[in-house]
């Protein structure tokens, strides 16, 4: 087969997938900051766009797996044409589902979408035995674990922040004492996450020592100084909210940067596979990723956030429950902590599901009536149909390509 038109088509679909990731998943990173009023939607898309591109281009992995997450057995695919058609089908299946979900403002997992696409074409080509069902079980487990653990963490962290900062007997003293502690702890987690997720460090222990503790300590000292100098005797609640508002922009910005570094692979993995086949004849289990393909993925994500990200931002930031800066900070802190612990334990986790779970947890800390139950129901349904719908679309597209190709 002549590879040039197939490579061009894959590049176009990779860009489309990156756009869809930006519109849905990347928009999620800024949703709590927008919902809490820390920044405007226009500021959010600008910040997210720049940081997503930066994360993808400068910190995206230069080697990516052709078969994401080991979800199907690559030894059963020896024909390069199958990998080309499969990559196209998986990209298109995932992209179509992400666009549908985004249109209705539903935050879904882009990783689960591409997994569905891969399983769809794999089953059509080689039957059910090609699927690693143990791995699929861990994906299903992540649907259940991620939001529950995220909600539990956020519920208790917000209760603790409310008790130590917002509702204590001596609020001025408590705000000065405890706000820097909570913010410092959050930055220990964020510094460690940056080491592992963005710089791709292997050791959690080294991440805590090299970046986590130093960053957390510096932020603790800066926050303490600001509260003492700028808010000596004024309303401590306003002082705490002021600090949390500024911090929330930083935590959301980190989420955007890390998301670009990690999830760009969902769009460019299949593109890199087809590019390697076009230039070298066949792709192995891992393929090199040229910088220009990383740039393509980063650009697509940035454009997606800017042009269509507002729908998911509105759902997560405003429709599930009412957010303030302390609640928004709690969500970011909880989600980052859960993802870090899950990575350390090797547990399957979805960042999207964890963030939504944390939003629900913060709402539940104020009572069940603070939650928009119909929105939560729609989101949960969308999570459970993500893999089957993306898989079905991918299967149909692969079958058509296999027949006409």
Swiss-Prot record:
GO cellular component, one term: plasma membrane
Record carries keyword Transmembrane helix: yes
Transmembrane segments: 3-23, 44-64, 82-102, 114-134, 138-158, 181-201, 207-227, 264-284, 287-307, 329-349, 384-404
The keyword Membrane is annotated on this UniProt entry: yes
Keyword entries, A-Z: Cell membrane, Membrane, Phosphate transport, Transmembrane, Transmembrane helix, Transport
Membrane topology value: Multi-pass membrane protein
Cellular compartment(s): Cell membrane
One GO BP annotation of this record: phosphate ion transmembrane transport
GO MF, any single term: phosphate transmembrane transporter activity
Function: Potential transporter for phosphate.
PANTHER family, A to Z: PHOSPHATE TRANSPORTER
Annotated family: Belongs to the inorganic phosphate transporter (PiT) (TC 2.A.20) family.
Annotated protein name in UniProt: Putative phosphate permease PYRAB14010
Species, as recorded: Pyrococcus abyssi (strain GE5 / Orsay)
